[in-house]
Amino acid sequence: MSWQTYVDDHLMCDIDGHRLTAAAIIGHDGSVWAQSSGFPQFKSDEVAAVMKDFDEPGSLAPTGLHLGGTKYMVIQGEPGAVIRGKKGSGGITVKKTGQALIIGIYDEPLTPGQCNMIVERLGDYLLEQGM
């Protein structure tokens, strides 16, 4: 299965008639493995800051998580595994696997819990596969 299929079928899936706004699978180095059409153009330093927060949990809290120029307020996550952010009625979930970052961006009517479930389910599966 291609990485694009994981994005299209597993991240951009339909839940009660709603779906993520955008999603991507990127390498720890910031290289894009696959992304949805609406995924924001991000900078390498934004990915570096996310990776740093996985190594040093809490490092993004003072500045927020930035992706594609959008700032998300960092909310509860799982140190070293998941970072969650909020912006207005939407937000972002980033799950770290051994080789990749699984990123989901949502807006209402999708809920934070639904976004977390979508992103973390794929991330957990990839971890089980050694990725």
Curated annotation (Swiss-Prot):
- SUPFAM superfamilies in UniProt: Profilin (actin-binding protein)
The cross-references to InterPro entries, in alphabetical order and at most eight, read: PFN, PFN_euk, PFN_sf, Profilin_CS
What would be one Pfam family of this protein? Profilin
Per the record's keyword annotation, is Cytoplasm included, yes or no? yes
> What Gene Ontology cellular-component terms does the record carry?
cell cortex; cytoskeleton
List the signal peptide residues.
Answer: none
The keyword Cytoplasm belongs to this UniProt entry's keyword annotation: yes
Say where the protein is mainly found.
cytoplasm
In terms of CDD domains, this protein maps to: PROF
Task: Report the locations given in the UniProt record.
Answer: Cytoplasm, Cytoskeleton
Q: Which GO terms describe its molecular function?
A: actin monomer binding
Q: Which UniProt keywords apply?
A: Actin-binding, Allergen, Cytoplasm, Cytoskeleton
Q: List, alphabetically, the PROSITE patterns matched.
A: PROFILIN
Family, similarity comment: Belongs to the profilin family.
Function text:
Binds to actin and affects the structure of the cytoskeleton. At high concentrations, profilin prevents the polymerization of actin, whereas it enhances it at low concentrations. By binding to PIP2, it inhibits the formation of IP3 and DG.
Q: Describe its partners and assembly state.
A: Occurs in many kinds of cells as a complex with monomeric actin in a 1:1 ratio.
Q: What is this protein called?
A: Profilin-5
Q: List the source organism.
A: Hevea brasiliensis (Para rubber tree)
